Amino acid sequence: MISIITPFHNCPELIPDYEKAVQGAQVIVIDNASEEDTAVKLQAMVGRLSNDSKYIRNDVNQGYSKANNQGLAIADGEIVVFLNSDIVSAGDWSDRVKNAKKGAFYAATTGVRVVDGEAIRYLEGWCLFGHKSDFEMIGGWREDWEGMYWEDNELCWRAEMAGLELKQVDLPLLHYSNYTTSRTPGAYDKRPSNQALFERIVRQDKNNG
């Protein structure tokens, strides 16, 4: 089984395309304190999806990482997909996810951050997947981030430190980059401090290694 975990915060206009993209999987929606009309629409969507799908509502926005960990804790699938809500599918992509092997994380797109002159590769978190046991092995998503950004960088850094591979796969998915972030008040405010935290983590790990 594949479990798809998606935090939602408002933006109900994304629901139709999202629903089309996740057919056939267990879908776990973490509603991060959306407005009531959005919450009603999200619950209705989950009701139309697989019988194994689940809806959790947070009264307060818990942020991206905590929401992902909430979903990870209740996922029934051997493979879990952390998927953003602002996506469109151009075809079936489940077979490529089912081929995921243990010992690696996968994503549709990758990026690079530079810390002290060293390029550090990461998988972009808008569609990131792997075996549930591997995510549990590294402790899931780090939760002490404020605002948004750099969560996927740290997760992938920790994964590589634990011996996991980072692999890019071609998926028929389109991501509306920053669509939801730009509509979340304060989302960018902590980006510089999150970057500084990530850089401290990398330096500490290198010094301890």
Over which residues does each language-model region extend?
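Short, well-formed alpha-helical segments that are part of the catalytic scaffolds
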Residues: 10-24
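Short beta-strand-to-loop element that shapes/binds the nucleotide-sugar donor at the catalytic cleft/hinge
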Residues: 106-119
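A conserved acidic beta->alpha catalytic loop
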Residues: 21, 31-42, 87-88
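Short beta-strand/loop segment that forms part of the nucleotide-sugar
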Residues: 25-36, 54-58
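Glycine-rich, basic loop-to-helix element that forms the pyrophosphate-binding segment
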Residues: 58-75
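Short aromatic/hydrophobic "clamp" motif used to bind/position activated sugar donors
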Residues: 80
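Conserved donor-nucleotide/metal-binding helix-loop-beta segment in metal-dependent transferases, i.e.
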Residues: 94-106
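C-terminal catalytic/acceptor-binding lobe
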Residues: 147-209
